[in-house]
Design a protein with these regions (language model features):
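Membrane-proximal helix-turn-helix segments that form the acceptor-binding/catalytic region
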Residues: 182-191
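C-terminal helical cap/extension that packs against the catalytic core
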Residues: 201-216, 304, 348-410
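ATP-dependent carboxylate-amine ligase catalytic core
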Residues: 29, 34-37, 63-156, 172, ...
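Beta-strand->loop->alpha-helix junctions that form or flank phosphate-binding loops
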Residues: 198-199, 211-233, 253-258, 282-291, ...
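Extended acidic/charged loop-beta regions that coordinate divalent cations
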Residues: 74, 123-173, 205, 209-250
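Short functional linear segments
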Residues: 1-46, 53-66, 71, 107-114
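Nucleotide phosphate-binding/pyrophosphate-handling subdomain across enzymes
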Residues: 133, 138-143, 149-162, 166-171, ...
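Hydrophobic alpha-helical packing residues
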Residues: 57-62, 131, 380, 427
Length: 432
């Protein structure tokens, strides 16, 4: 197979396999030579902020001189984005070599009457092969869904576990309450391994403490009051962590969203907790935070154009918190879309209750999961936005929204990671 055929094969996997057990994933890893044992892992779970926290940690470790792998999901434009080595997306040849090894294993398993690896399992196995062959020191590993039964949990003996904010999402798989979902996320904890977690939700925090104590894990809880924001500009945020280790140290991050401060704080705390295993100077810590790059989360893709993959109640609440800061002085335009398994009605109502946009445009994404543009437009109208443009084609909708933004405004593109991916693809095509 060539690269394009390999990608097509992987994308077709969900059609002919089902969820496998962690024992199945462990057996696959064993037959691949246990590549995950050739590096140390920092395992990250949570509802929102996983990818950003992974990116902060990876950037700091790179600045400190360590070789790092980064495994995240989903991808926005190309599947290779899920695998980074030293903050660079892998090339097609590296992808194909790993795929061929995992495909050979998959064929052997099926011939033996066992199960083909799932879509996510296949990508995880490829990632472990890629990082082992690259000889990295550390891998920052983001869970796919949940934690307890997530395929990444088969990668045992992490250096630390990190759990970001917990909220209601993927309820059909993880549970109907924050506590139930937190229990699934806490499933990544390993006896004796330190865990650093977002403690802002009291129900989730209680579950984290209970699990950590039961497993004998040293645990570190962070809340918003443990941080102080000094300044927010169009270029980023300056904040400090109320921690005796860092005293008056101020950190700069290149993101405008307030919620990124908690993700950054979790990363800083993780580096601190691991200081005896992974020495990092204060200078490297500060520089790594300032240089962090992450796609699709309050990311500035063009001057004045921000894309954010907020797609659930917690994510939208955090988006609104950021937009509120800018609406006082800058006219705002919104490009919105959503997929049908998200609570887009409540998302829109939250946005409309607190933000007044100069112009609103809706579009549709997600293939068979798309929500018709007129349905989205009608919800905006019901929530007090009489003038809403409905444009099905994403490139046309983005072009219209960018024009409405004008020279003095800001354009926020929100509601779905699919929307973020399509917009980034549009921008990339224009640059070619």
């Amino acid at each position: 197979m060539n690269y394009e055929e390999a990608v097509a094969y992987i994308e077709d996997i969900p059609r002919f396999t089902t969820k496998n057990s962690l024992d199945h994933t462990r057996e696959c890893l064993r037959r691949l030579g246990d590549p995950q044992r050739k590096f140390r892992v920092i395992h990250v779970a949570g509802t929102n902020g996983k990818g950003s926290t992974c990116a902060f940690i990876t950037s700091v470790l790179r600045e400190a001189g360590y070789s790092c792998g980064l495994f995240t999901s989903p991808h926005l434009v190309e599947i290779n984005e899920r695998f980074q080595i030293n903050e660079e997306v892998i090339d097609d040849d590296t992808f194909l070599r790993a795929f061929e090894k995992v495909k050979k294993l998959s064929d052997e398993l099926v011939a033996e009457g066992s199960y083909h690896p799932t879509y996510f399992e296949t990508l995880l196995l490829m990632g472990m092969v890629i990082f082992a062959e690259a000889g990295v020191d550390y891998v920052t590993l983001e869970t796919g869904l949940g934690g307890r039964l997530d395929a990444t949990t088969a990668v045992e003996n992490p250096a630390a576990c990190v759990i970001t904010s917990i909220s209601l999402d993927h309820m059909q798989y993880l549970g109907n309450t924050v506590s139930e979902i937190a229990g699934e996320k806490a499933g990544i904890m390993v006896p004796g391994v330190p865990v650093i977690y977002d403690g802002n939700d009291p129900d989730a925090a209680g579950v984290m403490r209970e699990h950590a104590e039961k497993l004998g894990c040293p645990y570190y809880e962070l809340k918003r009051e443990d941080t102080e924001i000094h300044k927010i500009t169009k270029d980023g945020i300056r904040f400090s962590l109320k921690d005796k280790t860092y005293g008056d140290t101020v950190f700069d991050i290149p993101f405008i969203a307030r919620y990124q401060v908690m993700n950054a704080a979790l990363a800083v705390k993780t580096i601190q907790v691991l200081e005896n295993q992974i020495p990092v100077s204060l200078e490297a810590l500060k520089a790594g935070m300032a240089k962090t790059r992450w796609q699709g989360r309050m990311e500035t893709v063009l001057p004045g154009v921000i894309v954010d993959g907020a797609h659930n109640e917690d994510g939208v609440e955090k988006f609104v918190e950021t937009a509120e800061h800018f609406q006082k002085e800058i006219p705002l335009t919104l490009l919105f879309s959503a997929v049908d398994d998200k609570d887009y009605t409540d998302m829109i109502r939250t946005i409309c209750s607190r933000i007044r946009f100069r112009h609103v445009i809706v579009t549709q994404v997600g293939g068979y999961r798309k929500v018709p543009v007129e349905e989205l437009a009608e919800i905006f109208r019901e929530d007090g936005v009489p003038e809403v443009e409905a444009i099905e084609d994403v490139p046309a909708a983005f072009e219209r929204a960018a024009k409405e933004k004008g020279e003095d405004g800001m354009l926020f593109c929100v509601g779905s990671l699919y929307l973020v991916g399509e917009i980034k693809a549009v921008i990339r095509r224009k640059k070619l």
